[in-house]
Amino acid sequence: LDIHLHDSDYPLHVVLHYRVHADYDLIERSVRVINDGKTPVTLERVLSAQWHLPALGEYRLSHVSGRWADEFQLQREPLTVGVKTLESRRLTTSHHANPWFAIDRGQADEYQGGVWFGVLEWSGNWKLLAEVTDFGSTRVSLGLNDWDFAWQLAPAETFKTPVSYAGYTPDGFGAASRTLHRFTRAEVLPHKDTIHKVLYNSWEATLFDVDVKSQSKLAEIAAALGVELFVMDDGWFHGRKDDEAGLGDWWPDTKKFPNGLKPLIDKVQALGMTFGLWVEPEMVNPDSDLYRAHPDWVIHFPTRKRTVARNQLILNFARTDVQDYILDKLDKLLAENAIAFIKWDMNRNVSEPGWPNAPGDPRELWVRYVQGLYRVWGTLRERHPDVIWQSCSGGGGRADLGILRLADQIWVSDNTEATARLAIQEGFSHIFPANTMEAWVTDADAAHVPLE
């Protein structure tokens, strides 16, 4: 169903799009804005949906909050007159909140009670507004964050928002989560209900100290445990001795792998496992061939010093030349090597969010960055359809239905301590199905798990 709205004073045309997913009891909502005039129009706020609840109810909001290593902490609180705002301004979905909500009348549990719920399919800045008006009506608005947002709409051009999905169940929070799980597995995930392999990741064993010899030995240990997929984490690429150099130069380091990755991959396959690799394509170290050649490719303000965090800067994925460079390097890596799995990481938040010489309004950065990410990742998926991809962002900082159209799994948290993971994964499970949840078994310090 499309509802067409025309501004009576300006040549602006808005289309409210609805689609019913009857098999899942979900409604899809998005918005298109069309410039019917002869001059450009600048959009500064356009949400995907506003979901209205039955009138005169006293409602409770469920959402998740968190931080690094403590994501997806379930919160429940009453909604009172005013506006409750949840958002991300971090270029990713964020560790601190998630574009998901569940609302009940304060008495629902896992098995019974009416629950209204919804999500946003987007991997960048977002905003959720849960509002109780002075007339007692309750509504939830969800979409792109209007903070520092703008989009210049040329004549005859169309801007489309991300999609929001919402539903209702009389059977409690468990039924609400299972509805989202079924929909995500059947309609969103690239490999649907695929059962993923048991993997071994090199990071906590060797950190950056990787080479053919050390990783071959580690692969033998992994194979003896019955592991099916061996993943080499950070440290394998050009100039990577520690976290101060190498990001952006996505080819094997010739000192660590003088004959490329093939000898290690052959060893892993001979042991009966497939091979996976860690990358962080959106980042660059100042000490890298890429940055020395293209210092203008990072997100920055020309009048301010560039803030280096984790010894790295963020590549501007809104730029097509940046997209093409990363696409070329990763496509070559996958084409030349038998890589079955990629862990795509994104480890720092944005600062100085500038785009010098942007072709339009520089504030388009927030949306065009995510569109560029989707283009690169989506193209790689098309060219290498059998590869399994994992979304990681310093843990669970990029977890949403938008990224799950590209990634098969989400690294839920960098916190691998078992008792902490119980709460993290409980919150995660309200939104996402279990087959998207990646977890490790690691050693835990006695201070974290006291015998008492």
Positions of the model-derived regions?
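Polysaccharide-binding surfaces and accessory modules of carbohydrate-active proteins
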Residues: 1-132, 147
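Short loop/turn motifs at secondary-structure junctions
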Residues: 27, 42, 160, 225-226, ...
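Short Pro-Gly-centered flexible turn/kink motifs
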Residues: 151-169
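Glycan-recognition surfaces
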Residues: 285-324, 367-452
